[in-house]
Design a protein with these regions (language model features):
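Helical element adjacent to the flavin cofactor pocket in flavoenzyme catalytic cores
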Residues: 360-382
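N-terminal Rossmann-like dinucleotide-binding module
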Residues: 1-44, 232-233
Length: 382
């Protein structure tokens, strides 16, 4: 029998847990494992990809593999908004592929009917809501299904517990509690009641095509819609003005924190001002000779950019040139080189023009603006 070829994106705690379960599944071959910042899009062809990367990457990674004829298993949440999840579901149907979101369907028959507790020390509150979407909201699907008439009530508690109630059509009322100051092992109300290996069992069913993919996606979409609703009421709404690289990054980061974000741009598309026309390089600070703090900020942000938008990077050692004019410059050639040395920036003097006192050659990171724009569109939608 032909082995099922699997690749995985994600080497974090859940990624390691997934790999330990995959090792136990028969008729399966793990072809590659990438970190979320590695070149996952350049790996060999597989039958299934396992996505266990940070939440804001799920949409673009799932979309890439569904567009390239690969089945997808994705860690919850599938996406951060229901509209993008619905798009992925339609894409999987169009390409006749299996798409599955990590779930806890195995707990369905042993879950409390109206009171849910989730206690975990640390972490982010938005992430807790996304987890509740699949551990708790997910499991009330059979009773509720229709969320058109839904109301939320935030209950103030004397302790640090966070409590809210969801009321569906005045028929079903569910109480949810989570606590960030819980210093004991993490606990949610359904886990103590099942002693089997739910994760391994789920992976086996999914990768061998024996799971109910349609039901999984219906429940996942339902849970994501409730999660959107809850986060909107708990964390509120915010606006980001300007869809350059800073505005887009801020908007996507705020979205992962639970905010309902509107991104405004005066142009007809994103990245049409400085982010889209400025030589396609990631500045390291060579053009800020009068501010060491700004140079340091540029150097630090360069590494953040490379990690967050790694798929757009073309060349880490692209040659660029900077000159000091002979006339009207506020910085002399000597002062310029002194500042670069203090900042730890590399340079090499090269032949210069007659109207320049100095020209240096440097190496900076060069990115593909078309790929960057595509990544940004996906992050905004995801």
């Amino acid at each position: 029998m032909k082995k099922i070829k699997v690749g995985q994106i994600g080497k974090g705690s859940f990624g390691k847990k997934l790999l330990s379960k995959l090792d136990n599944i028969k008729n399966l071959s793990i072809e590659w494992v990438c970190g979320s910042q590695d070149k996952w899009w350049k790996q060999k062809k597989i039958d299934w990809v396992i996505i266990a990367s940070p939440n804001e990457f799920h949409y673009e990674q799932a979309k890439y593999f569904l567009e390239n004829n690969t089945n997808v298993f994705c860690e919850k949440p599938g996406t951060l908004c229901s509209k993008s999840l619905k798009e992925l579901i339609e894409l999987s149907k169009k390409n006749n592929l299996n798409f599955y979101i990590d779930d806890v369907l195995i707990y369905e028959n042993i879950t409390p009917t109206n009171n849910f507790v989730y206690k975990k020390w640390g972490g982010s509150s938005a992430n807790i809501i996304d987890r509740m979407a699949y551990h708790h909201f997910y499991l009330i699907y059979n009773e509720v299904k229709d969320i058109d008439d839904i109301n939320i009530k935030i209950i103030k508690n004397k302790t640090n517990n966070k409590i809210f109630e969801l009321n569906f059509n005045n028929k079903h009322i569910y109480k949810f509690e989570y606590d960030f100051n819980w210093h004991k092992p993490k606990h949610h109300s359904i886990s103590p009641q099942y002693n089997g290996d739910a994760l391994e069992k789920m992976l086996t069913y999914v990768l061998h095509g024996q799971a109910d993919f349609s039901l999984n996606l219906q429940r996942s979409l339902f849970a994501t819609k409730i999660s959107e609703y809850v986060k909107k009421h708990i964390y509120g709404k915010c606006a980001v003005v300007g869809a350059g690289i800073y505005g887009i990054t801020a908007a996507t980061k705020l979205k992962t924190k639970g905010f309902d974000v509107d991104l405004f741009e005066a142009e007809d598309d994103i990245l049409k001002a400085a982010s889209g026309i400025n030589q396609y390089r990631i500045h390291r600070g060579y053009h800020y000779p009068r501010s060491l703090d700004t140079i340091k900020s540029c150097k630090d942000n360069e590494q953040s950019f490379i990690k967050y938008y790694n798929q757009s990077i073309l060349d880490r050692n692209s040659k660029h040139y900077y000159s000091i004019a002979t006339e009207d410059s506020l910085t002399t050639a000597e002062q310029y080189l002194t500042v670069l040395d203090k900042a730890g920036l590399e340079w090499k003097i090269v032949d210069t023009l007659p109207n320049c006192d100095l020209t240096i050659e440097t190496k900076e990171t060069f990115y593909n603006p078309t790929i960057l724009k595509n990544i940004c569109h996906n992050r905004i939608k995801g």
